[in-house]
Design a protein with these regions (language model features):
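Active-site-proximal substrate-binding groove within the catalytic cores of carbohydrate-active enzymes
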Residues: 1-123, 139-143
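C-terminal beta-strand-rich structural cap/linker in extracellular carbohydrate-active enzymes
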Residues: 122-160
Length: 160
């Protein structure tokens, strides 16, 4: 937890925010459990895998943290074959409606694989990515205050 506010932001959310910046942790690694160290190792591997996309891709701010309880960022490769969307919700909401997040910067004629679905760029940019969570006020692991999720989009060729 933060030593001043005693809030405990999950390691997943810390990493999901840090990927889009300088990728660092503000914590005492000596205080981490073995499980937390293993989680951080996986997060570092993820960062290494997508480092060039985060560093050299085109960045979009999809939702501003200053206008609602949601923030969303996106980075798209220059050839528009892959993208990563970061969605962040600091405070849990109860009984919220069905939500979609319109994306930016994709190729409207390319098909992208995301969340087990194949969707065209024009659909993702005009209709949006489904971002509703399934908690609906229930206490589920990983869904609550300081919730975040990354969506990995990869181009899917028609014959694949």
């Amino acid at each position: 937890p933060n030593h001043q506010t005693f809030r405990n932001t999950p390691l997943e959310t810390r990493a999901n925010v840090a990927y889009f910046g300088t990728f660092g942790y503000e914590l005492d690694v000596n205080q981490l459990t073995f499980e937390e160290k293993e989680i951080i190792k996986k997060q570092i591997s993820f960062m290494k895998q997508y480092r060039s996309l985060f560093q050299f891709g085109t960045f979009y701010r999809l939702k501003s943290p200053f206008t609602s309880n949601e923030t969303a960022w996106m980075v798209v490769s220059h050839d528009k074959t892959q993208a990563i969307v970061g969605y962040y919700r600091p405070l849990q909401e109860v009984n919220v409606g069905y939500r979609r997040l319109p994306l930016l910067g994709l190729d409207e004629d390319k098909m992208y694989h995301v969340n087990g679905l194949d969707l065209y760029g024009d659909e993702l940019m005009n209709v949006g990515l489904i971002i509703s969570d399934s908690s609906c006020g229930e206490n589920k692991d990983g869904i609550g205050d300081y919730y975040s999720k990354l969506y990995i989009l990869k181009e899917r060729k028609e014959n694949e």
